[in-house]
Amino acid sequence: RFRQMESGLPEEYQDEQELEKQRNIHDQLITKGMEVITDSYLDVPKFKCKDMNIPFVGKSLEGRNWIELVRDINESNYDLVVMGVLGLGAIKDSSIGTVTERVIRRIQTDTLIVKHIPDLHGDQEGSGKIVVAVDGSGHSFGGLKTGIEIAKLTGRPLEIISSFDPYFHYAMFNSLTGVLSKEASKVFKFEQQEKLHEDIIDKGLAKIYQAHLEISKNIAKEEGLDCTIRLLDGKVFEKVLQYAREERPHLLILGRIGVHSAPDMDIGGNTENLLRLVPCNVMLSSRVFKPKVDMVADESIEWTSEASERLQKIPGFVRPMATTAILRYALERGHSMITSGVITEACENILPAGAMQAMNMIGDK
């Protein structure tokens, strides 16, 4: 950059020898200056850690900032990465710094993004809660486990929230009204589909997300911690954002990716929107935790009467094992109701050919 600006230097600096001299001075100042600045930055946490008897290791990385941070994080076995949401280049309308955004997209380590600094923003009134948002994904339950640990260590109250959107299909069907021809409506079975959503899917969604909350509450209870739960309805990131603005929690914990994300997704859409907009500190959880099968089943799985009858025909000494296997099969495939057909599918999938008949495990159909 300095060399690009050389043509604009005063005339007395245009001599070749003088230019070379200035280049050397500039290079030395920049190299040494950057080292001094970096070491000065590290001195701040170094002395804070010393005062609190916390071991400290400083690293001065040379190179493009976000590239070197990503490389170091991915090569190291860190439990947690802490970054400010904004850097030195922040302006009034900045929502997230480019370095922070580039780093979080390229790492798979739990990351705390600091957004509220009392010395800068003042002590704002708020709930002081540790809040965990769950959607049934392993990442959100992993965040819950971390939230429980933090709540225990800090003595702060824990609240678990979940949000579902029962209104999306209304917008979808309204948009289709003026698009589908009569023939297409018949093929799509427009009226039947709309009624199905109104009668079943809306109520089913509420039940699913309430189950996530009950499961989360049970997990916290097993850890010896009381918590509160809250179900929100509406556009997910909008409702969680509204909640965060009203409650002003101390920390909001989000799964890095959600229940509908592909495994190789860098960050989920709701998490990304909330990271930019919520006024509180945010933790992105890369930790994955799966609740016990029986705990999930108790809150989210029901059996038809026929399926229950078939289950009772399984010999008692293997019934618990068979029940767990059937539940796991159903959960992995997203079933909330176990029918006789699901039992048959599960046993065919689990047992070798002919074993069902030989062991007489599933009774008469």
Tell what function each PLM region has.
Residues 174-200:
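Flexible internal linker/loop segments at domain or repeat junctions
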Residues 1-3, 74, 79-91, 95-154, ...:
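Intrinsically disordered or low-complexity boundary/linker segments at protein termini
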Residues 316-324, 337-340, 356:
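The conserved phosphate-sensing helix
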Residues 203-207, 241-242, 257, 261-265, ...:
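Protein-protein interaction modules outside structured cores
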Residues 329-350, 357-363:
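Conserved C-terminal helix/linker of AAA+ ATPases
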Residues 2-7, 17-81, 191, 197-252:
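Structural beta-alpha unit
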Residues 311:
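Conserved RecA-like P-loop NTPase ATPase core
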Residues 96-97, 255, 267-268:
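Glycine-centered tight-turn and secondary-structure capping sites
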